[in-house]
Curated annotation (Swiss-Prot):
Molecular functions (GO terms): rRNA (guanine-N7-)-methyltransferase activity
Compartments reported by the entry: Cytoplasm
EC number: 2.1.1.170
Function: Specifically methylates the N7 position of guanine in position 527 of 16S rRNA.
Gene Ontology, cellular component aspect: cytosol
Biological source species: Psychrobacter sp. (strain PRwf-1)
Pfam family, one: GidB
Keywords on record: Cytoplasm, Methyltransferase, rRNA processing, S-adenosyl-L-methionine, Transferase
Protein name, UniProt field: Ribosomal RNA small subunit methyltransferase G
Highest classification ranks of the organism: Bacteria, Pseudomonadati, Pseudomonadota, Gammaproteobacteria, Moraxellales
Catalytic activity: guanosine(527) in 16S rRNA + S-adenosyl-L-methionine = N(7)-methylguanosine(527) in 16S rRNA + S-adenosyl-L-homocysteine
Family to which this protein belongs: Belongs to the methyltransferase superfamily. RNA methyltransferase RsmG family.
């Protein structure tokens, strides 16, 4: 049995949540070790613990938070393009920290203008010994990497508008890179039409275990003429 002494919030629900997480991982057909699973649950525990002071999420119930935050982010893993990743508007680290735990070889930068949320991420990844994440407290317009430091993949689940996401993300994208936005419904046709002259757009339907809501990953690749 797992030693749950390091858990502050979910210790009395650990076995139930671990079983749920393992079943979700099996359904998603992703390869995650027992140690990575423990780190995902520790991240969830820290999210709920820090939430009392830092207002990181409106979701306070551990099972609901596991499904709507952790498992929701895990569902994109089979579809993520390879390479260095930037997560814009990461909030408490979603999906960036979740991806980092599961893909320790991938360099990931998580960016948010909210200092408290970045402070939470810094503390959490230090305690979890997640070494492939660089947290940045900045507005996106003030984050301008040099050409050689741009990103192969830019993700976000924070933008309601796909055009706003593209406007923010495209200048930080390396040549040949991919934009991948976590969405509920497929973006409206008029929004897609604005972008289709410059971007190849695909909408991937996601099946998120235990989440009875529509989810899509909208990916965009620059059209080279």
């Amino acid at each position: 049995m797992m030693n749950t002494a390091e858990f502050k919030v979910i210790f009395n629900q650990y076995d139930e949540l671990d079983t749920l997480l393992l079943e979700a991982i099996t359904q998603l057909k992703i390869d995650i070790s027992a140690e990575q699973r423990r780190k995902l649950l520790l991240y969830l525990d820290k999210l709920l613990f820090w939430n009392k002071a830092y207002n990181l999420t409106a979701i306070k119930q551990p099972k609901e938070a596991l499904i709507k935050h952790v498992i929701d982010c895990l569902a994109i893993l089979p579809h993520l393009k390879p390479g260095k990743l930037l997560d814009i508007g990461t909030g408490a680290g979603l999906p960036g920290v979740i991806v980092a735990i599961c893909e320790p070889e991938r360099p990931i930068t998580v960016l948010d203008s909210n200092q408290k949320k970045i402070r939470f991420i810094r503390q959490s990844i230090s305690e979890l010994q997640v070494t492939n994440v660089t947290p940045v407290a900045s507005r996106i317009e003030n984050f301008n990497p040099d050409e050689g430091d741009k990103f192969a993949v830019v993700t976000s689940r924070a933008f309601a508008s796909l055009t706003d996401f593209v406007e923010a993300a495209a200048p930080r994208l390396a040549q040949g890179g991919w934009l991948q936005a976590m969405k509920g419904l497929i973006p409206e046709p008029q929004e897609l039409q604005v972008l289709q002259d410059q971007w190849q757009i695909d909408n991937i339907a996601l099946s998120v275990p235990y989440l009875h809501e529509t989810r899509h990953l909208t990916e965009l690749h620059k059209i080279v003429i």
